[in-house]
Amino acid sequence: MKYISNAKYGEPVETGTIYRGDNKRLGICVHRLHGCGETLYMDCMALGIIDRKLNNTSAISAINEAQSLAKQELDLLSKELNSILNSEIEISRY
């Protein structure tokens, strides 16, 4: 997947502080927080992930880690959805 960096024109894209995925549905973004050094964080609006700390400090490794974390979350959601769909519907007052 393509990522857009906010690196200054003429500088390597890895020098940026924000790497936003070119996917509108998931909205994966890897970024640094001002005042937190070289630590990278991820956001994924579709999964409700905001400022999750990543273990990698290089852009490519952090993006790979963020994609892996998004996949893990999607797998958990898929299992939960399958559980809901395979269970009998029950309606109660309380």
Predicted regions and their residues:
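Negatively charged, low-complexity tracts enriched in Asp/Glu with abundant Ser/Thr
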Residues: 1-23, 87-88
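Short aromatic-glycine-(Arg/Gly/Cys) micro-motifs in beta-strand/loop hairpins
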Residues: 26-51
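Mixed-charge, Lys/Arg-enriched low-complexity segments
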Residues: 44-94
